[in-house]
Amino acid sequence: MGLLLLVLILTPSLAAYRHPDFPLLEKAQQLLQSTGSPYSTNCWLCTSSSTETPGTAYPASPREWTSIEAELHISYRWDPNLKGLMRPANSLLSTVKQDFPDIRQKPPIFGPIFTNINLMGIAPICVMAKRKNGTNVGTLPSTVCNVTFTVDSNQQTYQTYTHNQFRHQPRFPKPPNITFPQGTLLDKSSRFCQGRPSSCSTRNFWFRPADYNQCLQISNLSSTAEWVLLDQTRNSLFWENKTKGANQSQTPCVQVLAGMTIATSYLGISAVSEFFGTSLTPLFHFHISTCLKTQGAFYICGQSIHQCLPSNWTGTCTIGYVTPDIFIAPGNLSLPIPIYGNSPLPRVRRAIHFIPLLAGLGILAGTGTGIAGITKASLTYSQLSKEIANNIDTMAKALTTMQEQIDSLAAVVLQNRRGLDMLTAAQGGICLALDEKCCFWVNQSGKVQDNIRQLLNQASSLRERATQGWLNWEGTWKWFSWVLPLTGPLVSLLLLLLFGPCLLNLITQFVSSRLQAIKLQTNLSAGRHPRNIQESPF
């Protein structure tokens, strides 16, 4: 069960305080206040971080498909038929890698972040990849997709090198092919998507300039003033406002559609030279995976969301934003907050689902590396306990600061009281001058300090439990590492002490019987037979 986060939205004056640890608090209150919600102050905001808790996904708009940036990760494997040519092949590989300055050469960690997502609305664009032996990441139904691009990912593309072409840029001899439903592309071209992004290297194989009449309008996603264009050469999308100039926005280095299509195929490198012989020799294959670089955006594939798509992926995916299961409740309700343990937080009966929380929250922006099932449960719980202990420390420090401010205010009030008594000394003091009862404020800071001390002790206890819970196992394994080899001799010695006397008696009896048999056999062989005495008839 995931940990439930509960945040109390306080009064507007306190909630306006910007705290780096609570961006959700600030964003949620801004959204509630802008919509005129009665729950903009004094309420509970609850969310679940469990990967199995239903969440809500919102598809990205067509314009966001042109602005969300992706990145590529490259890995390679040697051809199994390559023998005795590793040295020149390594030289060629280092040359080819120099042509990929904008590609990360360390593969990411793959896997779904959430597995129970409900898509709200219709996705304007979906990408379908079909491959016989690919990695299935999930499939969206066709009813939730406005336009579906189908990628022909069963092709195997090769780049051939000769000796004098070792330093030429690698590129797909045939780019991944995309098919569309009939009537999707209109015969309306534009020069808006000409050129290349200035922030990217021009040596990458997919950054070839678009030819004329190859940047076509997508009918289902365009209007009279706003066009969504497809560059079929680079498999990139562009958004153009016909009422404005050409230089409207900077195109991302790697677009989402380009990354998704490139990740469905791999580039094979072959060579012909005096090193490899006159025939075509396959050397290695590049496997390219893609990830979303824009913070807060995810691939939505079926009911799963992913931060990265592996090479040779299959399924039907779109991009969008995700929020976990969120609900709000009035602040006068009593919500139990577990300090330590794995008991789930019960859902409040009067809770209201907080659906309008959109992409600006960025709740899941930091979960791209995270991935379920990588760490051990015991380590996770110990880290969780440490985090809770740290939160208690932070809360104790906040209470200490508030108490210091109250003490300072009380000192100022008492000082003013003494000053007024001095000014009204002739009338007997301020109380007699006002003809009112004289009241004094009893400072409760001692009780507050005791409570803070208890919180700090509880945090220390939690931290020790978390540390000992993990380190005890680690220490036990250290003892096992040298005690375990002594277990065999100790067990053997114990068995010998238990059954040794019995075995010794059995061996003694066996030896004695054998000696008696040998002695009898010796007597018989020496002719010492007993005489047969016949009885006399008389």
Curated annotation (Swiss-Prot):
Keywords, A to Z, come to:
Cell membrane, Cleavage on pair of basic residues, Disulfide bond, ERV, Glycoprotein, Membrane, Signal, Transmembrane, Transmembrane helix, Transposable element, Viral envelope protein, Virion
Which ranges does the record list as Cytoplasmic topological domains?
500-538
Keyword Methyltransferase in annotation: no
Fusion peptide as annotated region, ranges: 354-374
For side Extracellular, which residue ranges?
16-478
Q: Where is this motif: CXXC?
A: 43-46
Among the Pfam families in the record, one is TLV_coat
Q: Where in the cell is it found?
A: Virion
Q: How is it modified after translation?
A: Specific enzymatic cleavages in vivo yield the mature SU and TM proteins. The CXXC motif is highly conserved across a broad range of retroviral envelope proteins. It is thought to participate in the formation of a labile disulfide bond possibly with the CX6CC motif present in the transmembrane protein. Isomerization of the intersubunit disulfide bond to an SU intrachain disulfide bond is thought to occur upon receptor recognition in order to allow membrane fusion.
Q: Does the keyword Transmembrane helix apply?
A: yes
Record remark: domains: Contains the CKS-17 immunosuppressive domain present in many retroviral envelope proteins. As a synthetic peptide, it inhibits immune function in vitro and in vivo.
Annotated protein name in UniProt: Syncytin-2
Q: Which organism is it from?
A: Homo sapiens
Upper lineage = Eukaryota, Metazoa, Chordata, Craniata, Vertebrata
